[in-house]
Design a protein with these regions (language model features):
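Acidic/His-rich, metal-assisted hydrolase cores and their charged scaffolds
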Residues: 1-209
Length: 209
């Protein structure tokens, strides 16, 4: 996401803006990416090199502690807050949603898969109000979704990974994904890899292998 934003600024499609990275994991992975810069593809290297040469083009800041994170919600004027927290059910992003959802001048952009029943999914489904920390919050901010940015492998990628096993596992458990997609993926494993013991666990069930 950060690379996309920097690239938009580079192409003059976004004005000079402030970007706040408010996620310990996102901060760590960003610094890790910088460390292994040479492993990036050519386009990413070019974008990153441009940013190093034009550090003032983007006001980029990494947030360290929780109090500093909460202070972001008092910002006046335009800013982008990147806060990673899966389904929006926990972590720093919840405080940002509590503060920013009620205001129509704000926008929330969700880039990852949101499971049914999660706060993120309710926002994607364009509900009018949500409950956060026991408080009813009106959703007046505009909600946007961008596909294709998930860090998870797709069906083809997962099947390729499974094909790398030298010996087929005794049992495969499909534990991530909604019911329909899990059933389809389990069927693919059985048919394409000829692995018969593929289980989709149900809530509170236990298995002994």
């Amino acid at each position: 996401i950060l690379f996309l934003l920097i690239n938009l600024v580079k192409r003059k499609l976004l004005p000079h803006l402030s970007i706040w990275i408010d996620s310990p994991m996102a901060s760590a992975t960003t610094h890790l990416t910088q460390r292994y810069f040479s492993e990036l593809d050519a386009q990413s290297q070019h974008t990153f090199s441009w940013f190093q040469e034009h550090p003032d083009a983007v006001n980029l800041r990494f947030i360290a502690d929780v109090e500093e994170s909460k202070a972001l919600n008092r910002i006046k004027g335009g800013a982008i807050i990147i806060s990673a927290s899966g389904m929006c059910d926990a972590g720093r992003v919840v405080h940002h949603l509590l503060s920013n959802l009620p205001h129509e001048q704000n926008a929330v952009v969700i880039t990852g898969f949101q499971a049914y029943g999660s706060l993120g999914r309710r926002l994607v489904d364009k509900v009018k109000k949500v409950r956060i920390f026991g408080e009813e919050v009106m959703v007046r901010a505009s909600i946007h979704t961008i596909g294709g940015l998930s860090a998870h492998a797709d069906q083809a990628g997962l099947l390729d990974w499974l094909r790398g096993f030298k010996q087929a596992p005794k049992t495969v458990f499909v534990v991530h994904g909604e019911a329909e997609s899990s059933s389809v993926f389990a069927a693919c494993i059985r048919e394409e890899l000829d692995w018969k013991e593929v289980i989709i666990p149900e809530r509170l069930h236990t298995y002994s292998c």
